[in-house]
Amino acid sequence: MAELDDQFETTDSGASTTYPMQCSALRKNGFVMLKSRPCKIVEMSTSKTGKHGHAKVHMVGIDIFSNKKYEDICPSTHNMDVPNVKREDLQLIAISDDSFLTLMTESGDLREDLKVPEGELGEQLRLDFDSGKDLLCTVLKACGEECVIAIKTNTALDK
């Protein structure tokens, strides 16, 4: 009998990109969806219960992909959506002419679907890579979006 070598591509499980959490349970430096964008909470304050209802929670968050500031106020008993945020360090292999990164996962698979980040981080990444440093790129994934948010020198190499 011939040996079967089936190759299955991994796909999204179809799980929700967010989960509900009561507003009063959210914390500073946590994540929350503000104006349908995944944000990191940078400021939170609670107002007292008024004569017409619930205590209110005022939140200020920074979009984890665009760094835009968003604000929202909601009753402390209401549920807010919290994004499922996944963080992964990938080894930088190459940078293409059209600014796409070639990254290697821990399992050895190559990814070529992420662009060099805009601004200072992108410039630093190019400088360090061109000077021959072995780099790890920290990739943040939430709500179907991904981007490189940080770089660091790979110290785990066998010398």
UniProtKB/Swiss-Prot annotation:
GO CC terms in record: cytoplasm
Post-translational modification: Lys-51 undergoes hypusination, a unique post-translational modification that consists in the addition of a butylamino group from spermidine to lysine side chain, leading to the formation of the unusual amino acid hypusine. eIF-5As are the only known proteins to undergo this modification, which is essential for their function.
Keyword flag RNA-binding: yes
Phenotypic consequence of gene deletion: Severe larval growth defect.
Gene3D superfamilies reported in the protein's UniProt record: 2.30.30.30, Nucleic acid-binding proteins (2.40.50.140)
Keywords: Cytoplasm, Elongation factor, Hypusine, Protein biosynthesis, RNA-binding
InterPro entries: IF5A-like (IPR001884), IF5A-like_N (IPR048670), NA-bd_OB-fold (IPR012340), Rib_uL2_dom2 (IPR014722), Trans_elong_IF5A_hypusine_site (IPR019769), Transl_elong_IF5A_C (IPR020189), Translation_prot_SH3-like_sf (IPR008991)
One Pfam family it belongs to: eIF-5a
GO molecular function terms attached to this record: ribosome binding; RNA binding; translation elongation factor activity
Subcellular location field: Cytoplasm
Any one of the GO BP annotations: translational elongation
Residue numbers bearing the Hypusine modification: 51
Function (record text): Translation factor that promotes translation elongation and termination, particularly upon ribosome stalling at specific amino acid sequence contexts. Binds between the exit (E) and peptidyl (P) site of the ribosome and promotes rescue of stalled ribosome: specifically required for efficient translation of polyproline-containing peptides as well as other motifs that stall the ribosome. Acts as a ribosome quality control (RQC) cofactor by joining the RQC complex to facilitate peptidyl transfer during CAT tailing step. Functions as a regulator of autophagy.
Assigned protein family: Belongs to the eIF-5A family.
The name this protein goes by in its record: Eukaryotic translation initiation factor 5A
Organism name: Drosophila melanogaster (Fruit fly)
Gene: eEF5
